[in-house]
Curated annotation (Swiss-Prot):
Belongs to the G-protein coupled receptor 1 family. It comes from Mus musculus (Mouse). Odorant receptor. The lineage of its organism: Eukaryota, Metazoa, Chordata, Craniata, Vertebrata. It comes from the Eukaryota. PANTHER family: OLFACTORY RECEPTOR (PTHR48018). It is a multi-pass membrane protein. This is Olfactory receptor 5AP2. The keyword Membrane applies. One of its GO terms (biological process) is G protein-coupled receptor signaling pathway. GO terms for molecular function: G protein-coupled receptor activity; olfactory receptor activity. The gene is Or5ap2. Residues 54-61, 128-140, 225-244, 300-317 are cytoplasmic. Keywords: Cell membrane, Disulfide bond, G-protein coupled receptor, Glycoprotein, Membrane, Olfaction, Receptor, Sensory transduction, Transducer, Transmembrane, Transmembrane helix. The chain crosses the membrane at residues 33-53, 62-82, 107-127, 141-161, 204-224, 245-265, 279-299. Its main location: membrane.
Amino acid sequence: MVRSGKGIQNKNATEVTEFILLGLSDNPDLQGVLFALFLIIYTMTLVGNLGMMALIKIDRSLHTPMYFFLSSLSFVDASYSSSVTPKMLVNLMAEDKSISFNGCATQFFFFGSFLGTECFLLAMMAYDRYAAIWNPLLYPVLMSGRICFMLVSTSFLAGFGNAAIHTGMTFRLSFCGSNKINHFYCDTPPLLKLSCSDTHINGIVIMAFSSFNVISCVLIVLISYLCILIAILKMPSAEGRHKAFSTCASHLMAVTIFFGTILFMYLRPTSSYSMEQDKVVSVFYTVVIPMLNPLIYSLKNKDVKKAVKKILHNYVV
């Protein structure tokens, strides 16, 4: 998916100081519809994720490792959606669709940081579910408050560190030709396509880091769930198996949607790359997935439902 560069840069060309985000569609009849649709989705994303964080903070019964991770995930979802969606909404209604060079680099960095953090965080959550089901007696020791904090901190450090490398590698390049990004946010492939520098090294580094990070996270998830499956099958009672599976079902669904989209997006061969297809998939994981996660984790979660009812009874009734 990452393309090689343009060869030797033209030193006499004027360096780009801002970019133009072409967006999802140039059809003016669709702009208002898309604005209304994405505004609704973004509002639901903020309400769902910030509401989940507040609920976990308020209700002491949710002060467990599982919900500590979920609260962190909600923060990450709200953050990486907010790094892209507000600018996209503005561009849908504004004639000026420009973004400054530094603004593009900032968006690129924070989106990559939170996206990478989510990748690692979902892997840590899979390990948490494994620890809870494989050995419930040792679970408080294996997932103490200190260990949970270290795992979440490591996820953030890995996500932000990875994004810092990508941002430095991308924005050290020269952009001296067209400044029109065929996307609704600053993403790697369209930026490398615009560069008049040799992007061969960028392609190698980005593919190596992306592949390692995604594959390592996926392996942690797969190994954790394989151990979980073995533990569930060994349980003597059907009720115990059902209860154990129900605690993992929502996370498994979220993991499948997220990593399935990321694997399709970033690890498919260059020959199958299509910018229009890329935009559609990008909408799904930048806008839709952050909205879905609070719904996935709360709809069939008895603890969350109970906490919501308790708060409604205490503060509304």
